Amino acid sequence: MAGAVATVSVGLAWLGLMAAAASATQFRVGGGRGWSVPDANAEPYNSWAGRMRFQIGDQLLFVYPKEMDAVVVVDQGAYDACNTSSSVAGGGGGRYDDGNTVFTFDRSGPFFFISGNEANCRAGEKLVVVVMADRGGRHAPPPSPPAVPPPVAPVPMPSPASSPPSPAPAAATPSLAPSPVATTPSPSPSVSPMAPAPAPTTSTPSSPPAPAAMAPSPSTTPGGVAQPPPPPGTDGANATTPAAPAANDRSGAAAAAPVVAGVVVTSLGAYIGYAMLAI
Protein backbone atom coordinates (compact mmCIF):
# COMPACT_ATOMS: atom_id res chain seq x y z
CA MET A 1 0.00 0.00 0.00
CA ALA A 2 2.77 2.46 0.93
CA GLY A 3 4.69 1.62 -2.27
CA ALA A 4 1.65 2.34 -4.41
CA VAL A 5 1.11 5.72 -2.72
CA ALA A 6 4.77 6.67 -3.25
CA THR A 7 4.61 5.68 -6.92
CA VAL A 8 1.51 7.80 -7.48
CA SER A 9 3.10 10.78 -5.72
CA VAL A 10 6.27 10.60 -7.83
CA GLY A 11 4.17 10.34 -10.98
CA LEU A 12 2.19 13.45 -10.05
CA ALA A 13 5.36 15.39 -9.33
CA TRP A 14 6.85 14.36 -12.68
CA LEU A 15 3.69 15.44 -14.48
CA GLY A 16 3.85 18.78 -12.72
CA LEU A 17 7.42 19.31 -13.82
CA MET A 18 6.58 18.38 -17.39
CA ALA A 19 3.64 20.78 -17.42
CA ALA A 20 5.78 23.59 -16.03
CA ALA A 21 8.52 22.91 -18.57
CA ALA A 22 6.03 22.89 -21.42
CA SER A 23 4.67 26.31 -20.43
CA ALA A 24 8.02 27.80 -19.36
CA THR A 25 10.01 30.32 -21.43
CA GLN A 26 13.72 29.95 -22.08
CA PHE A 27 15.72 33.15 -22.45
CA ARG A 28 19.14 33.15 -24.16
CA VAL A 29 21.45 35.49 -22.31
CA GLY A 30 23.35 37.86 -24.68
CA GLY A 31 21.38 36.85 -27.74
CA GLY A 32 23.51 35.60 -30.61
CA ARG A 33 26.73 36.63 -28.94
CA GLY A 34 26.02 34.55 -25.88
CA TRP A 35 27.48 34.87 -22.40
CA SER A 36 30.46 37.21 -22.91
CA VAL A 37 31.83 40.67 -22.17
CA PRO A 38 29.43 43.14 -23.82
CA ASP A 39 30.92 45.66 -26.23
CA ALA A 40 30.28 49.35 -26.17
CA ASN A 41 27.39 49.18 -28.61
CA ALA A 42 25.62 46.22 -26.96
CA GLU A 43 22.76 46.60 -24.53
CA PRO A 44 23.83 46.02 -20.97
CA TYR A 45 22.64 42.73 -19.47
CA ASN A 46 20.62 44.43 -16.76
CA SER A 47 18.81 46.64 -19.25
CA TRP A 48 17.86 43.56 -21.24
CA ALA A 49 16.68 41.77 -18.05
CA GLY A 50 14.60 44.80 -17.06
CA ARG A 51 12.58 44.52 -20.25
CA MET A 52 11.81 40.85 -19.73
CA ARG A 53 9.18 39.30 -17.47
CA PHE A 54 10.53 36.28 -15.70
CA GLN A 55 8.22 33.79 -14.03
CA ILE A 56 8.88 30.80 -11.84
CA GLY A 57 9.76 27.92 -14.08
CA ASP A 58 11.37 30.07 -16.78
CA GLN A 59 14.96 29.31 -17.81
CA LEU A 60 18.15 31.17 -18.69
CA LEU A 61 20.46 29.73 -21.36
CA PHE A 62 24.14 30.59 -21.00
CA VAL A 63 26.33 29.77 -24.02
CA TYR A 64 30.10 30.38 -23.60
CA PRO A 65 33.49 28.78 -24.24
CA LYS A 66 33.94 26.47 -21.30
CA GLU A 67 37.75 26.64 -21.41
CA MET A 68 37.71 30.40 -20.88
CA ASP A 69 34.55 31.26 -18.99
CA ALA A 70 31.91 30.04 -16.48
CA VAL A 71 28.68 31.05 -14.78
CA VAL A 72 28.63 31.63 -11.01
CA VAL A 73 25.43 32.19 -9.03
CA VAL A 74 26.19 34.47 -6.08
CA ASP A 75 24.52 36.76 -3.56
CA GLN A 76 24.39 40.53 -3.83
CA GLY A 77 27.61 41.11 -1.92
CA ALA A 78 29.63 38.80 -4.14
CA TYR A 79 27.92 40.32 -7.18
CA ASP A 80 29.00 43.84 -6.27
CA ALA A 81 32.56 42.72 -5.45
CA CYS A 82 32.88 40.29 -8.36
CA ASN A 83 33.90 37.62 -5.89
CA THR A 84 34.03 34.53 -8.08
CA SER A 85 35.07 32.28 -5.21
CA SER A 86 31.84 32.83 -3.30
CA SER A 87 28.91 31.03 -4.83
CA VAL A 88 25.46 30.45 -3.43
CA ALA A 89 25.12 26.91 -2.17
CA GLY A 90 21.89 25.07 -2.87
CA GLY A 91 18.72 26.31 -4.49
CA GLY A 92 20.20 26.12 -7.98
CA GLY A 93 23.29 28.12 -6.97
CA GLY A 94 26.87 27.21 -7.56
CA ARG A 95 29.42 27.36 -10.36
CA TYR A 96 28.71 26.09 -13.90
CA ASP A 97 31.44 25.62 -16.51
CA ASP A 98 29.95 23.17 -19.02
CA GLY A 99 29.73 25.82 -21.83
CA ASN A 100 25.95 25.35 -22.25
CA THR A 101 24.29 26.06 -18.89
CA VAL A 102 20.52 26.05 -18.44
CA PHE A 103 19.35 27.64 -15.19
CA THR A 104 15.69 27.25 -14.06
CA PHE A 105 14.02 29.72 -11.70
CA ASP A 106 12.49 27.79 -8.85
CA ARG A 107 11.39 30.78 -6.77
CA SER A 108 10.50 34.41 -7.02
CA GLY A 109 12.90 37.20 -6.15
CA PRO A 110 16.32 38.41 -7.35
CA PHE A 111 19.04 36.17 -8.82
CA PHE A 112 22.66 37.32 -9.23
CA PHE A 113 24.96 35.91 -11.95
CA ILE A 114 28.62 36.78 -12.62
CA SER A 115 31.31 35.45 -14.93
CA GLY A 116 33.70 32.89 -13.57
CA ASN A 117 36.51 35.16 -14.81
CA GLU A 118 36.91 38.07 -12.43
CA ALA A 119 38.22 40.40 -15.19
CA ASN A 120 35.18 39.67 -17.33
CA CYS A 121 32.90 40.34 -14.33
CA ARG A 122 34.52 43.75 -13.80
CA ALA A 123 34.12 44.45 -17.52
CA GLY A 124 30.32 44.07 -17.19
CA GLU A 125 29.75 40.32 -17.69
CA LYS A 126 27.23 40.04 -14.90
CA LEU A 127 23.46 39.92 -14.64
CA VAL A 128 20.63 40.58 -12.15
CA VAL A 129 17.25 38.92 -12.82
CA VAL A 130 14.14 39.52 -10.73
CA VAL A 131 11.59 36.72 -10.96
CA MET A 132 8.02 37.82 -10.39
CA ALA A 133 5.70 36.08 -8.02
CA ASP A 134 3.31 33.71 -9.73
CA ARG A 135 -0.10 35.31 -9.26
CA GLY A 136 -1.96 33.36 -11.88
CA GLY A 137 -0.62 29.93 -10.98
CA ARG A 138 0.87 29.44 -14.45
CA HIS A 139 4.24 28.35 -13.15
CA ALA A 140 3.29 27.00 -9.78
CA PRO A 141 5.94 24.67 -8.41
CA PRO A 142 4.98 21.04 -8.50
CA PRO A 143 3.35 19.91 -5.30
CA SER A 144 5.57 18.03 -2.98
CA PRO A 145 4.64 14.40 -2.69
CA PRO A 146 2.52 13.75 0.36
CA ALA A 147 4.21 12.12 3.24
CA VAL A 148 3.52 8.44 3.25
CA PRO A 149 1.97 7.56 6.59
CA PRO A 150 3.64 4.72 8.41
CA PRO A 151 1.78 1.44 8.21
CA VAL A 152 -0.71 1.14 10.96
CA ALA A 153 -0.32 -1.96 13.02
CA PRO A 154 -3.55 -3.95 13.09
CA VAL A 155 -5.41 -3.53 16.29
CA PRO A 156 -5.82 -6.92 17.95
CA MET A 157 -9.41 -7.86 18.25
CA PRO A 158 -10.50 -8.63 21.78
CA SER A 159 -11.03 -12.30 22.40
CA PRO A 160 -14.65 -13.32 22.92
CA ALA A 161 -13.79 -14.64 26.34
CA SER A 162 -12.75 -11.25 27.60
CA SER A 163 -15.68 -9.54 29.15
CA PRO A 164 -16.04 -5.77 28.95
CA PRO A 165 -15.08 -3.93 32.09
CA SER A 166 -17.96 -3.66 34.41
CA PRO A 167 -19.10 -0.10 34.95
CA ALA A 168 -18.19 1.46 38.22
CA PRO A 169 -21.07 1.03 40.69
CA ALA A 170 -23.05 4.16 41.04
CA ALA A 171 -22.79 5.79 44.39
CA ALA A 172 -25.76 4.70 46.41
CA THR A 173 -27.87 7.68 47.34
CA PRO A 174 -28.69 7.45 50.99
CA SER A 175 -32.38 7.01 51.33
CA LEU A 176 -34.08 9.46 53.62
CA ALA A 177 -35.61 7.80 56.60
CA PRO A 178 -39.37 8.33 56.57
CA SER A 179 -40.54 10.70 59.23
CA PRO A 180 -42.29 8.79 61.97
CA VAL A 181 -46.03 9.02 61.73
CA ALA A 182 -47.62 9.86 64.99
CA THR A 183 -49.93 7.05 65.78
CA THR A 184 -52.96 8.00 67.78
CA PRO A 185 -53.43 5.44 70.52
CA SER A 186 -56.66 3.65 70.07
CA PRO A 187 -58.95 4.14 73.00
CA SER A 188 -58.93 1.24 75.32
CA PRO A 189 -62.23 -0.50 75.34
CA SER A 190 -64.30 0.71 78.22
CA VAL A 191 -64.97 -2.02 80.62
CA SER A 192 -68.63 -1.98 81.26
CA PRO A 193 -69.45 -2.93 84.75
CA MET A 194 -70.57 -6.44 84.72
CA ALA A 195 -74.02 -6.98 86.08
CA PRO A 196 -73.86 -8.97 89.21
CA ALA A 197 -74.67 -12.54 88.61
CA PRO A 198 -78.02 -13.41 90.06
CA ALA A 199 -77.66 -15.15 93.29
CA PRO A 200 -78.47 -18.79 92.97
CA THR A 201 -81.86 -19.47 94.21
CA THR A 202 -81.89 -22.03 96.85
CA SER A 203 -84.64 -24.42 96.20
CA THR A 204 -86.35 -24.77 99.41
CA PRO A 205 -88.09 -28.10 99.56
CA SER A 206 -91.71 -27.51 99.74
CA SER A 207 -93.06 -28.61 102.97
CA PRO A 208 -95.03 -31.74 102.64
CA PRO A 209 -98.71 -31.23 102.81
CA ALA A 210 -100.18 -31.74 106.13
CA PRO A 211 -101.43 -35.20 106.58
CA ALA A 212 -104.99 -35.55 105.82
CA ALA A 213 -107.24 -35.20 108.73
CA MET A 214 -108.09 -38.33 110.26
CA ALA A 215 -111.12 -39.77 108.67
CA PRO A 216 -114.24 -39.25 110.70
CA SER A 217 -115.30 -41.99 112.68
CA PRO A 218 -117.66 -44.28 110.87
CA SER A 219 -121.14 -42.99 111.03
CA THR A 220 -123.88 -45.19 112.18
CA THR A 221 -126.49 -45.72 109.64
CA PRO A 222 -130.07 -45.84 110.73
CA GLY A 223 -130.04 -49.54 110.58
CA GLY A 224 -127.46 -49.66 113.27
CA VAL A 225 -124.73 -50.78 110.90
CA ALA A 226 -121.66 -48.72 111.03
CA GLN A 227 -120.66 -47.46 107.53
CA PRO A 228 -116.93 -47.32 106.78
CA PRO A 229 -115.59 -44.01 105.80
CA PRO A 230 -115.00 -43.43 102.12
CA PRO A 231 -111.54 -44.29 100.90
CA PRO A 232 -109.14 -41.49 100.83
CA GLY A 233 -109.11 -39.52 97.64
CA THR A 234 -112.73 -40.24 96.76
CA ASP A 235 -114.00 -37.17 98.50
CA GLY A 236 -112.72 -34.24 96.59
CA ALA A 237 -113.65 -31.89 99.40
CA ASN A 238 -111.84 -33.73 102.18
CA ALA A 239 -108.98 -35.38 100.24
CA THR A 240 -105.83 -33.42 100.22
CA THR A 241 -103.47 -34.26 97.35
CA PRO A 242 -99.90 -33.53 98.16
CA ALA A 243 -98.40 -30.94 95.86
CA ALA A 244 -96.09 -32.43 93.31
CA PRO A 245 -92.53 -31.35 93.74
CA ALA A 246 -91.09 -28.97 91.19
CA ALA A 247 -89.81 -30.87 88.21
CA ASN A 248 -86.75 -28.80 87.87
CA ASP A 249 -85.87 -28.81 91.55
CA ARG A 250 -84.13 -32.11 92.13
CA SER A 251 -82.92 -31.29 95.57
CA GLY A 252 -86.45 -30.42 96.74
CA ALA A 253 -87.87 -33.64 95.31
CA ALA A 254 -85.23 -35.65 97.03
CA ALA A 255 -86.01 -33.99 100.32
CA ALA A 256 -89.80 -34.43 99.95
CA ALA A 257 -89.65 -38.11 98.96
CA PRO A 258 -89.55 -39.45 102.57
CA VAL A 259 -92.42 -37.24 103.58
CA VAL A 260 -94.60 -38.43 100.71
CA ALA A 261 -93.74 -42.01 101.46
CA GLY A 262 -94.74 -41.48 105.06
CA VAL A 263 -98.07 -40.01 104.05
CA VAL A 264 -98.79 -42.88 101.71
CA VAL A 265 -97.95 -45.43 104.37
CA THR A 266 -100.15 -43.62 106.86
CA SER A 267 -103.05 -43.52 104.41
CA LEU A 268 -102.71 -47.20 103.66
CA GLY A 269 -102.63 -47.98 107.33
CA ALA A 270 -105.79 -45.99 107.95
CA TYR A 271 -107.53 -47.66 105.03
CA ILE A 272 -106.66 -51.07 106.30
CA GLY A 273 -107.86 -50.09 109.74
CA TYR A 274 -111.19 -49.02 108.40
CA ALA A 275 -111.52 -52.20 106.49
CA MET A 276 -110.86 -54.24 109.56
CA LEU A 277 -113.49 -52.32 111.47
CA ALA A 278 -116.02 -52.91 108.77
CA ILE A 279 -115.50 -56.60 108.94
From Swiss-Prot:
Residues 169-185, 212-226, 234-256 have a biased composition (Low complexity). Belongs to the early nodulin-like (ENODL) family. Residues 140-168, 186-199 have a biased composition (Pro residues). One of its GO terms (molecular function) is electron transfer activity. It is found in: Cell membrane. May act as a carbohydrate transporter. Promotes tolerance to salt stress in a redox-dependent manner. Pfam families: Cu_bind_like (PF02298). Residues 252-279 form a propeptide. It is a lipid-anchor; GPI-anchor. Residues 25-133 form the Phytocyanin domain. A lipid is attached at residue 251 (GPI-anchor amidated serine). Residues 138-256 are annotated as: Disordered. This is Early nodulin-like protein 18. Specifically expressed in reproductive tissues. Mainly observed in developing seeds and in mature leaves. Keywords: Cell membrane, Disulfide bond, Glycoprotein, GPI-anchor, Lipoprotein, Membrane, Signal. Disulfide bonds join 82-121. The keyword Membrane applies. Residues 1-24 form the signal peptide. Glycans are attached at residues 83, 238. One of its GO terms (cellular component) is side of membrane. Induction: Accumulates in response to thiourea (TU, a non-physiological thiol-based reactive oxygen species (ROS) scavenger), TU supplementation under salt stress (NT = NaCl + TU), hydrogen peroxide H(2)O(2) and H(2)O(2) supplementation under salt stress (NH = NaCl + H(2)O(2)).
